[in-house]
């Protein structure tokens, strides 16, 4: 086998490896995208719940008098 054929074979092997790697990375991106979409939905639900909570009747810290030991 001459050097040119060996170089072509090496390039074909590298290309096959890169194609496999790209496919694996693509699958990971899809999984992460699905996970991010689910987390965004959970965050929207949490924000909605927090916005519907009645405000606390406790005074702000700036309005509180200092504790007796001061």
Swiss-Prot record:
Entry superkingdom: Bacteria
Any Pfam family matching the protein: SlyX
Family as reported in the entry's similarity comment: Belongs to the SlyX family.
PANTHER family: PROTEIN SLYX
Entry protein name: Protein SlyX homolog
């Amino acid at each position: 086998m001459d050097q040119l054929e060996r170089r072509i074979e090496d390039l074909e092997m590298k290309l096959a490896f890169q194609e496999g790697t790209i496919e694996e990375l693509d699958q990971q991106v899809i999984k992460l995208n699905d996970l991010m979409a689910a987390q965004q939905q959970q965050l929207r639900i949490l924000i909605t719940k927090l916005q519907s909570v009645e405000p606390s009747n406790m005074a702000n810290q700036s309005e509180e008098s200092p504790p007796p030991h001061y």
